[in-house]
């Protein structure tokens, strides 16, 4: 009901902002589906019944990607990153040090091994080359930091990892958003690595920037995307001086309830930026930067 301006004979006429999001989602998916693959692989991990229901295979790597049901499932989990509930959770982790993120994963895996309730996370990493989503499955403490072992859908049969130093820097030495491209090292610090908990992707989802039936004010969505491969960024400043975005190379979010997310796509196009501002923010400036 939130996304439809009219429903006639069970046919939805979406609000213009929803059509814009759908167009953005389709454009992003043309660049790559790593987000959907990272989520689905985690959902299927250890669940032989669910895995067999797709194509009667024993491992994710054996799945035939041309299967329509599988493609639909991948696309669904890909677009969950557009949901406000997902963005709110991811934004809170984006503001944390990579060292703290590694420790969150270490604790979560320890709880899983004990048979206790655990969360499950996907990882998003960002660099000048683009964004990429991977699935962590183990963390080891090392001298000077941590090593996060990951499933990278571009290299499904190879062991990959992200090293995180005690001073909050990370490096993925074998990173490439496209398996046909030569791998090179990616690295970063606070604001370039995030965790997204699986619980946030379960729904139901809400549309805080859609017209509200209750008459309450709606939030504001701001998005920017480049036509080439150069990453763009948004700098938001409210009329009271609160900031959101990257300032002097560091991620800043001084606006309660606001979210900032790069929509992970692939190497051929820049990752679009999607910003949500709560209804309380009525006046603001938005500057686009490379």
Annotate the PLM regions.
Residues 12-25, 101-106, 114-124, 212-218:
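Short linear interaction motifs
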Residues 4-12, 113, 178-183, 205-210:
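Surface-exposed intrinsically disordered loops and tails
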Residues 1-68:
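Active-site-adjacent structural segments surrounding the nucleophilic cysteine of cysteine proteases
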Residues 40-131, 141-142, 153-155:
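Conserved active-site-adjacent core of cysteine acyl-enzyme catalytic domains
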Residues 127-199:
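Active-site signature of cysteine proteases
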Residues 29-35, 118-120, 131-134, 145-147, ...:
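Extracellular structured ligand-interaction cores
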Residues 200-290:
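Extracellular glycoprotein-like low-complexity segments
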Residues 125-130, 153-156, 224-229, 288-290:
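Short, flexible beta-strand-to-coil junctions
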């Amino acid at each position: 009901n939130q996304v439809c301006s009219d429903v006639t004979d069970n046919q939805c006429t979406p609000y213009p902002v929803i059509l814009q999001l759908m167009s953005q989602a389709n454009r992003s998916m043309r660049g790559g589906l790593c987000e959907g693959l990272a989520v689905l692989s985690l959902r299927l991990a250890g669940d032989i019944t669910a895995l067999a229901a797709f194509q009667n295979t024993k491992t994710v790597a054996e799945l035939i990607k041309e299967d329509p049901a599988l493609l639909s499932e991948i696309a669904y989990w890909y677009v969950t990153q557009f949901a406000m509930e997902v963005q709110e959770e991811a934004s809170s982790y984006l503001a944390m040090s990579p060292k703290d993120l590694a420790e969150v994963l270490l604790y979560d895996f320890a709880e899983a091994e004990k048979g206790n309730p655990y969360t499950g996370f996907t990882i998003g990493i960002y660099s000048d080359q683009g964004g990429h989503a991977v699935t962590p499955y183990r963390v080891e403490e090392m001298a000077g930091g941590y090593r996060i072992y990951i499933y990278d859908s571009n290299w499904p049969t190879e062991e990959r990892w992200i090293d995180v130093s005690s001073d909050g820097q990370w490096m993925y030495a074998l990173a490439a958003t496209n398996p046909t491209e030569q791998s090179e090292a990616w690295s970063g610090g606070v604001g370039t690595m995030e965790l997204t908990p699986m619980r946030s992707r379960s729904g139901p989802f809400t549309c805080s920037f859609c017209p509200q039936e209750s008459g309450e004010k709606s939030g504001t969505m701001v998005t920017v995307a480049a036509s080439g491969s150069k990453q763009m960024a948004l700098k938001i400043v409210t009329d009271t001086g609160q900031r959101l975005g990257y300032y002097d190379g560091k991620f800043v979010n001084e606006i309660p309830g606001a979210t900032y997310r790069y929509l992970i796509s692939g190497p051929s196009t820049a990752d679009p930026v999607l910003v949500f501002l709560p209804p309380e923010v009525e006046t603001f400036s938005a500057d686009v930067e490379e």
